[in-house]
Amino acid sequence: MLLPVPLLLGLLGLAAAEPVVYFKEQFLDGDGWTERWIESKHKSDFGKFVLSSGKFYGDQEKDKGLQTSQDARFYALSARFEPFSNKGQPLVVQFTVKHEQNIDCGGGYVKLFPAGLDQKDMHGDSEYNIMFGPDICGPGTKKVHVIFNYKGKNVLINKDIRCKDDEFTHLYTLIVRPDNTYEVKIDNSQVESGSLEDDWDFLPPKKIKDPDASKPEDWDERAKIDDPTDSKPEDWDKPEHIPDPDAKKPEDWDEEMDGEWEPPVIQNPEYKGEWKPRQIDNPDYKGTWIHPEIDNPEYSPDANIYAYDSFAVLGLDLWQVKSGTIFDNFLITNDEAYAEEFGNETWGVTKTAEKQMKDKQDEEQRLKEEEEEKKRKEEEEAEEDEEDKDDKEDEDEDEEDKDEEEEEAAAGQAKDEL
């Protein structure tokens, strides 16, 4: 049956609008992840990932993810998917990160690699397409990295995007669009957006300062000048310090022994400081000279900054001082709405229960510490009471001994008298 052209085009449009999921990983099949994720053998001491939902969670099964398990280690683990290009379509990269160890220094980001990556040799210098996610190291570094590899060079964003630094699970989303715009979301809320060309130094600047232009010699940028008619008053110059007129030489001052007496100095009440002529508006003031700009002959627009020929591997290539971070709910798609919905159905469903469990644990820990502190104080008081009791018994014994000695002495004296 032949369909009318408008209906056919509409159906084709609906088909084209279906989201394409290139990669999705939720770790819902137990140890099955070990068949999909490859450990790099580039170094023999890479840290190990384990499957865990952590010490607290919203749903013990749904919140299971890859957790770093060894302190002060590099980690290198990756998963491959069917290669694709994002040319002509949006790219959405999304995952959750949970720093339940209250991380002090370590990465929580992912890298997207082209198809040519040797997963068993993946390491920190392996060339990637995009690096995205949180990075924390001390109080000075708490940022979201958004790094693109452009013509073989890793280019960092010019903006500072602050990441979450608490112990709970957070959803990170990067959207790269075919119009060379981007958006970064945390917990499904936009935290940054803009133009790739404006916020990264992919290209030379459109404008440069005219090399042939220079500030005219008579260009006066001084807004104020000294008043040429102003002059210093004749009585202006006074010393800053003067001898104290109330000081007197001590009566016992011996000039042969102590030298010539000089009175101490004090601040001169008539001292006025350095004289400066008053300021007036400069009649020759022309404002700040602005260097004229010209079109940069080195600049050439690139409509395909956003595009990569091949995405095929998602990798966790990072360093952590204190382990315990959990990665979960990985998603790579071409559909922004689908990614937002997926985030709400995963992180969004369990986040409240996760916090409730953590709050309950914290309250139980607080009560336990209070009880331990109470018990410790009671034991200390009991020990003090026991010591006081022993001291009292010793005093009583000493008193009894003293009384006995006095009685014996009295008896002896009476005997002598007899």
Swiss-Prot record:
<feature type="modified residue" description="N6-(2-hydroxyisobutyryl)lysine">
    <location>
        <position position="64"/>
    </location>
</feature>
<keyword id="KW-0862">Zinc</keyword>
<feature type="binding site">
    <location>
        <position position="317"/>
    </location>
    <ligand>
        <name>an alpha-D-glucoside</name>
    </ligand>
</feature>
<keyword id="KW-0007">Acetylation</keyword>
<dbReference type="GO" id="GO:0005829">
    <property type="term" value="C:cytosol"/>
</dbReference>
<feature type="binding site">
    <location>
        <position position="328"/>
    </location>
    <ligand>
        <name>Ca(2+)</name>
    </ligand>
</feature>
<feature type="region of interest" description="N-domain">
    <location>
        <begin position="18"/>
        <end position="197"/>
    </location>
</feature>
<dbReference type="InterPro" id="IPR018124">
    <property type="entry name" value="Calret/calnex_CS"/>
</dbReference>
<keyword id="KW-0256">Endoplasmic reticulum</keyword>
<keyword id="KW-0703">Sarcoplasmic reticulum</keyword>
<feature type="modified residue" description="N6-acetyllysine">
    <location>
        <position position="159"/>
    </location>
</feature>
<feature type="repeat" description="1-3">
    <location>
        <begin position="227"/>
        <end position="238"/>
    </location>
</feature>
<feature type="modified residue" description="N6-acetyllysine">
    <location>
        <position position="209"/>
    </location>
</feature>
<dbReference type="GO" id="GO:0016529">
    <property type="term" value="C:sarcoplasmic reticulum"/>
</dbReference>
<comment type="subunit">
    <text>Monomer. Component of an EIF2 complex at least composed of CELF1/CUGBP1, CALR, CALR3, EIF2S1, EIF2S2, HSP90B1 and HSPA5. Interacts with PDIA3/ERp57 and SPACA9. Interacts with TRIM21. Interacts with NR3C1. Interacts with PPIB. Interacts (via P-domain) with PDIA5. Interacts with CLCC1.</text>
</comment>
<keyword id="KW-0379">Hydroxylation</keyword>
<dbReference type="GO" id="GO:0036503">
    <property type="term" value="P:ERAD pathway"/>
</dbReference>
<keyword id="KW-0732">Signal</keyword>
<keyword id="KW-0106">Calcium</keyword>
<feature type="binding site">
    <location>
        <position position="128"/>
    </location>
    <ligand>
        <name>an alpha-D-glucoside</name>
    </ligand>
</feature>
<dbReference type="GO" id="GO:0051082">
    <property type="term" value="F:unfolded protein binding"/>
</dbReference>
<keyword id="KW-0430">Lectin</keyword>
<dbReference type="GO" id="GO:0050821">
    <property type="term" value="P:protein stabilization"/>
</dbReference>
<keyword id="KW-0272">Extracellular matrix</keyword>
<dbReference type="GO" id="GO:0060473">
    <property type="term" value="C:cortical granule"/>
</dbReference>
<dbReference type="GO" id="GO:0005789">
    <property type="term" value="C:endoplasmic reticulum membrane"/>
</dbReference>
<feature type="binding site">
    <location>
        <position position="64"/>
    </location>
    <ligand>
        <name>Ca(2+)</name>
    </ligand>
</feature>
<keyword id="KW-0677">Repeat</keyword>
<dbReference type="GO" id="GO:0033018">
    <property type="term" value="C:sarcoplasmic reticulum lumen"/>
</dbReference>
<keyword id="KW-0479">Metal-binding</keyword>
<keyword id="KW-0143">Chaperone</keyword>
<comment type="function">
    <text>Calcium-binding chaperone that promotes folding, oligomeric assembly and quality control in the endoplasmic reticulum (ER) via the calreticulin/calnexin cycle. This lectin interacts transiently with almost all of the monoglucosylated glycoproteins that are synthesized in the ER. Interacts with the DNA-binding domain of NR3C1 and mediates its nuclear export. Involved in maternal gene expression regulation. May participate in oocyte maturation via the regulation of calcium homeostasis.</text>
</comment>
<feature type="repeat" description="2-2">
    <location>
        <begin position="273"/>
        <end position="283"/>
    </location>
</feature>
<feature type="region of interest" description="4 X approximate repeats">
    <location>
        <begin position="191"/>
        <end position="255"/>
    </location>
</feature>
<keyword id="KW-1015">Disulfide bond</keyword>
<feature type="compositionally biased region" description="Basic and acidic residues">
    <location>
        <begin position="352"/>
        <end position="379"/>
    </location>
</feature>
<feature type="disulfide bond">
    <location>
        <begin position="105"/>
        <end position="137"/>
    </location>
</feature>
<feature type="repeat" description="2-1">
    <location>
        <begin position="259"/>
        <end position="269"/>
    </location>
</feature>
<feature type="repeat" description="2-3">
    <location>
        <begin position="287"/>
        <end position="297"/>
    </location>
</feature>
<keyword id="KW-0458">Lysosome</keyword>
<feature type="binding site">
    <location>
        <position position="26"/>
    </location>
    <ligand>
        <name>Ca(2+)</name>
    </ligand>
</feature>
<feature type="binding site">
    <location>
        <position position="135"/>
    </location>
    <ligand>
        <name>an alpha-D-glucoside</name>
    </ligand>
</feature>
